Amino acid sequence: MRSSHRLAFLFLLPSLIFVGLFAFYPIFESFRLSFYRSILTLPWLGHKMVGWENYTDLWTDPVAAQSLRTTVFFVVTTIPLELGIGLGMALVMNEVFRGRGLLRAIVLIPWAIPTVVSSQMWRFIFNDRYGLFNFVLFGGDASRYLAPLADPILAPLTIIVAEVWKTAPFVALIVLAGLQTIPDELYEAASIDGATVWQQFRHVTLPLIRPALLLALLFRTIDALRVFDLVFVMTQGGPADATNVLSFYGYKKIFAEGMVGYGSAIAVGVFLVSLILSLVYLQILKSSRLERTPR
């Protein structure tokens, strides 16, 4: 090993140790526990090796199937909304006008607020008695109200609204970074050729910010798959499991029912899906960069 490589490795070593302790070890431990039958509320039953039994039970569990459908619905709904809204916000923030810096700072406030705090805020907003949602919807008439957090149809939508409000600014920040790498000369040349604003956006802007969009898509898909804190604070998976996503279902199995092995199997499933999607997105991102590389 050359001295420069050795020095680089020494600089990386503390980070590698940190990641190993706080990321790789929990993943390994979850894999290990998923092959055991261990119920914390029934300790006299012991810690029994059951092989793939937790995974076969998970495959036939109707609640797990419902949680999977809820998670998929959450992902396929929030991601397009976040990308669309984030792209629009980035295009506005990329324009030159007075107060642009202040606008960028304000836009990032939802992302900067801790998720637990913003979840509690949205829980108050959607409260059926004193929430702002009912006040605006019914013009302050306290005798009329909706209870969106207690409605199996509306409750998932409240989670989606809270998620998009918080994470669209993050997407906007990534896309804005991509927009600022596009040379102005390309737009000037397109204008000289008679391209309209839409044509410039379609043939100049979109192709050049594709890597930024893919990166935002990767981050947001992984984050949406493991959504937990919004559900924990706002609905606790209810009503009637309408917002019971996989991460929260695994949490309930471990900490409410004491089924450590089964809950670990759920966690492993979420991790593997996230890993596969990450590898697919990274391959697409790599292909996109190779297409842009001059030959």
Spans of features found by a protein language model:
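A structural signal for multi-pass alpha-helical bundles of membrane permease subunits
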Residues: 4-295
